[in-house]
Design a protein with these regions (language model features):
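Polytopic transmembrane helical bundles with strong interfacial aromatic enrichment
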Residues: 2-148
Length: 148
């Protein structure tokens, strides 16, 4: 009987999760990069000739901070292994970036006010992300466990 092709090979969940860790690391780095690009661009946009609005400055600082949170979540997944809580933390960080920071950018740069009501949900997503991260780290597995 022929051996199964790689497309039909099943992998345990623990082997699949590091791909998620890698993506959270990559997306965290890209988000950090875009926050620097946006900071520089916003400083020179004619629409902000009178100064960058406080809401945009807040969005930038929150994007930078939560980009680090994404990087940390990716590292935690690498160290702790498969964890639904850590996975949820990463996704909630991403949702928060979209609903909070990118929504405020669109609102102030493009005058796009369509999803203004979703901004607080981005903040709520970040709160839940940090709680999920705490639970995931507290449960621990792999090289990081409860005895450490």
């Amino acid at each position: 009987m022929p051996s199964p092709s790689p497309a039909h090979t099943s992998f345990p969940a623990a082997q699949v999760w590091p791909l998620s860790a890698r993506w959270f690391l990559v997306l965290g780095a890209i988000s950090a990069c875009t926050s620097v690009v946006f900071s520089a661009a916003f400083a020179h946009l004619p629409v902000f000739a009178g100064g960058v609005p406080t809401a945009v400055q807040t969005a930038l600082s929150q994007q930078q901070f939560h980009s680090l949170g994404l990087l940390f979540t990716g590292l935690a997944l690498r160290v702790c292994g498969a964890s639904r809580w850590l996975q949820a933390a990463g996704w909630l960080m991403l949702v928060g970036l979209l609903l909070f920071s990118f929504n405020l950018y669109a609102r102030h740069v493009l005058a796009w006010d369509t999803f203004r009501a979703l901004v607080p949900w981005g903040g709520a997503a970040w709160i839940l992300a940090w709680l999920a991260l705490a639970v995931g780290l507290a449960q621990g597995s792999g090289r990081f466990n409860r005895q450490s």
